[in-house]
Amino acid sequence: MYARLLDGKSAVITGSGSGVGKQAALLFAEHGARVVCADVREDWNEETAAQIRAAGGEAEAVRCDVTRRADVDAAVARAVSAFGRLDVIFNNAGVASPMTPEGGMKSFVEASDEDIDRLLAINVKGVLYGCQAAIVQFRKQGGGGVIVNTASVAGMFGWGGALYGATKGAIVNLARRLAVELGPENIRVNNVCPGSMVTNFGIGGLGVELPQAALDGMAKLQPLGRIIEPREPAQVALFLASDLALNITGINVPVDGGVMAGK
């Protein structure tokens, strides 16, 4: 009955060139969605779209800098022009905490104006732009639709990385507020909240390749004892985007190996 969870749906996925976004694009397409892959890194993004097409799926690749409202609007417009409508947007693009020249995470007071502006522009404004563009299109179609955002467990509890956590905390609350506001229009809004995760940019997207001993130590901090893989949050995003979650809105789903269970 649920072999293809998004059969015939049209979806936009930001940050689709790597990590969770890439895995989500492949999964959504595997489950029948027609996907607009939207990423600022054109070569990686084209590769994702090519993989979908090679597997028999439908995909469009667009360059999208989520800090530019026009780019986000254009990604939604491409879904409509290519596939006739928009059913799902997965606002996944994001960046991690700013780093020092030595490769460590900057403390809160070390963050420059440029660091602050970059995190707010990508992690907050980029998601806001995606939500706004999707809502406008959903209303043109008569209502109904799904918004999924990538937040983080860093936005759900206090533990270092205050600047990054603040940007993700904004998205945590955004889902709750929008879910209440948009529920009468049958528009669902939910977040997937990864914990420590290995991506193309190292652990947690920090751009630092950690030795195995450090990875093992981080894994031990999680009750399930292992680091999150990008496909795992992508699978939760697939569920939230599908009709299996028809009566689920306004929630933040931790994919963290059990870390939040102890908070």
Task: Please state what every model-predicted region is.
Residues 1-3, 105, 237-238, 249-263:
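Short C-terminal tail/terminal secondary-structure segment
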Residues 100-108, 112-117, 218:
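Substrate-binding pocket helix/loop in short-chain dehydrogenase/reductase
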Residues 152:
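Residue(s) in the substrate-gating loop at a strand-loop-helix junction
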